[in-house]
Amino acid sequence: MASVVLLPNADVSNDWTLSTGSDVYALLDDQVSTLGADSSYLSSTSAGSACVVELQDFSEAHSRINSVTLVTVSGNGARAASHVLETRLGSAGGDYYTESSGVIPAHRTDYVTKTYTTRTTTDGSTAWAEATLNSLRVRVDLDAHTSGTTQFTYLAVTVDYDEPVATDNSILFGTNF
């Protein structure tokens, strides 16, 4: 098995506050461990903020796509503050999965990485296909927010896949293997 990480590469919509620039996707593609050291993130001071991004295309040679796993990194440094992200993995045609991060507690200085449920199908029975992966969108809502400023800095989908079986028709010492 092999894996590849698909990062955001296009904006669809957004109402979070951007720390810099004008592209949401560009603020969600790097991992930083501490809130204070980060200069590339989305932020919000109230529940209801949402963004939708498209992901990079899956272009790996493969024989089978086994699963996808969504990861987000966010944090809120305010004392006793917490937040909840709601994620929707889908396409322009609708959502495949909606999942809550659960309560992410304040961590004063560090971001918190949340790994969501690994999904082996798009709908409970249909296997992932390259075309499906190449049209993926992720929506992230700040579903709950107690105080302070929530920062959202990273989003990725890890695709686990089988590489194609190599066929080797080498002739060694006059014998075809």
Residue ranges of model-derived segments:
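Short glycine/proline/serine/threonine-rich loop/turn segments at secondary-structure transition edges
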Residues: 64, 122-135
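Extracellular carbohydrate recognition and processing domains
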Residues: 95-127
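Short, surface-exposed beta-strand/strand-loop-strand elements in extracellular ectodomains
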Residues: 80-93
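Enriched but not universal
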Residues: 1-26, 156-177
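Short beta-strand-plus-loop segments that form exposed binding edges in beta-rich domains
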Residues: 139-148
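A short beta-strand element within beta-rich, extracytoplasmic domains
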Residues: 62-77, 138, 157
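Short carbohydrate-recognition loop motifs
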Residues: 29-47
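Short beta-strands within extracellular/lumenal beta-sheet-rich domains
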Residues: 43-61
